[in-house]
Amino acid sequence: SSNSIIAPLAASQDSINNPPLYPFIGATFVKIFSSILAPHDAIRLSNFIWISLTLVSIGLMTRELWGTGFGRQAGLIFIASIGLIFNVHTIRPEVSALLGFALALYGFALYHRRPFRASLVLGFGISIIFLSNGILSLLSIFITSLTLLFIKQWRNKRYYLFCLISSIVALSIISPWVYLLYNSNPEIFFSWINKVNAPNGEEFFFYIKNLLWFTWPALPLFIFVLIKNYRNIFQLKKIHLPLFFSISILFTLSLNAKIDQINLMPILLPFSVAAAGGIDLLRRSSASALNWFGILIFGFFGFIIWFFWFAAIT
């Protein structure tokens, strides 16, 4: 494969499918752990870091929206989601993009309390999304920022400044790579830019069909929270922010001609964060059962993953 950090290419490729963040970090892990791990295992170890940072972001945003004590519940719902379990081991840039989406959502959640810090977090999240998945994935962030303007508590000059600073931060991180790619390989640059296929109408129904199993057990709890709070959706940030974010992601996916269930991963974030509030609304016995179910599921899969990993290297 090509050694270029700017445009990492496999031997059979003449254009890039995605920006270089995920392969660059993966290659770094391969180099660091070359003496003890096979390349594909080293890259999967980088997945563990991406997902761990995503979990930290989920905990922070859930605490910001729901208060202390909810972060662990959101994390358990997230890691127990079937879609994550099926895709967490895959060597795909969607894994690193997930951290970007988590940071972006945390940035919006943090806005009212710490607007400047929130703008930095959002800008950094946007950068990770772009440098992992390209520009189309950013559409969901853009749509979310626009839909929030329909809510009175977001419609003020401070919010516009928040969006502006976030954009400046993101551009300052993204622009160097775009500039270097254009200058070093204009053919690859234009090939990548033009690699946008028109949707054919099947995308939306594909994702709706796969939504229930992919987001289980987050989706039922998310719906439960919406039903319980439907009168106050527009007053409660902890409800309307995850809802708008989810709708924006689904709309963006309907425009993505590359149909793949792994593209649903970002929607696990708002579902899990909102669902965390639903656990306290359940009866005490049901909430306790769900809590222990999440702990047991996480423990079981954690044991299985580490068991096979040790078996593979010994």
Write out the residue ranges for each language-model feature.
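Extracytosolic helix-loop segments that constitute the early lumenal/periplasmic catalytic or substrate-binding loops
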Residues: 1-14, 21, 28
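Transmembrane-lumen/periplasm boundary regions of multi-pass, lipid-linked membrane glycan transferases
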Residues: 1, 124-125, 132, 137-261, ...
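Membrane-interface transmembrane helices that cradle and orient dolichyl/undecaprenyl
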Residues: 63-69, 104-121, 128-129, 279-282
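Transmembrane-helix motifs of polytopic, lipid-linked glycan transferases
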Residues: 45-65, 103
